């Protein structure tokens, strides 16, 4: 049996950003080449296909990429560069390799097994690149399974519901202004002033089902000049249809354009739907393993959602207990839960 804890820690040392997971891909390939599987490389990702001479495949998917975050943990397996596996993808890959090890030693299974190592989950394009490759159709995918580590849920337990993660829409706004010396700024278009009003008013659009917020705010380079632009980059997360909050945002932008006689561009085309699980798969999986029903939809986005639009899917959360939150530079967890996580998932890939 391979050591999934060691694998997780090895991968934690070498975090790489989306579509740049070259060393990560090599590490995984060097393990897979010793198994009785066909290895498909897709960009910086891989798919290990274990044939049991069946005409359909069950696919387990994990993600590979890290974040541009400087780790603050003082552990021997700390990141060796300026990136960090602050979202648990190192653990996801370790679990997937544990599954590879199991099915490599199995004589028969109701279906063929595909273990998918997907690049670039954190930035748009990872799951789309897999779907565009048609590899999932080529192996005749019947259904897909995946999971994500999740803080504040009971350590070692699996959780799911019908809509587990919200939709995610990128919001990119630019307010145009006039670049003049502040001594001559009276009656000029002040992009920073307008943008600040837009920021405050847009945050007020959030409610229990919809969230809008901005992580990037950019304006100006000179302290004594009006900025020619004010840029906001953020996201809308919605537990239901985001058209209502999107419509309110567009109305707010139109009002500010008319009031201040300026141009405000708003691009919201980058969109991931919510992660919707197949009800039949939920019910069947609960007959096999202990999965706790979640009472809420979380506002995280997850590009596994593109798979749920095409195939029956089951996506779960693996609780890691009282840890730092995801995407925090101090995120870490008790990785002794990983071997049992592998054992919990195995029956879901053996369903007839």
Placement of each model-derived feature along the sequence:
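Acidic/His- and Gly-rich active-site-bordering loop/insert found
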Residues: 1-85, 94, 101-111
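Divalent metal-coordination and catalytic microenvironments
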Residues: 11, 60, 89, 115, ...
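Histidine/acidic-residue-rich, glycine-tolerant segments that coordinate divalent metal ions
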Residues: 46, 67-69, 74-84, 90-91, ...
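A short beta-alpha structural unit
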Residues: 47, 213-220, 236-238, 264-283, ...
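Short amphipathic alpha-helices in soluble, non-transmembrane regions
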Residues: 130, 245-255
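A conserved active-site cap/scaffold subdomain adjacent to cofactor or substrate pockets
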Residues: 194, 223-245
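Zn-dependent metallopeptidase/amidohydrolase metal-coordination segment
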Residues: 293-350
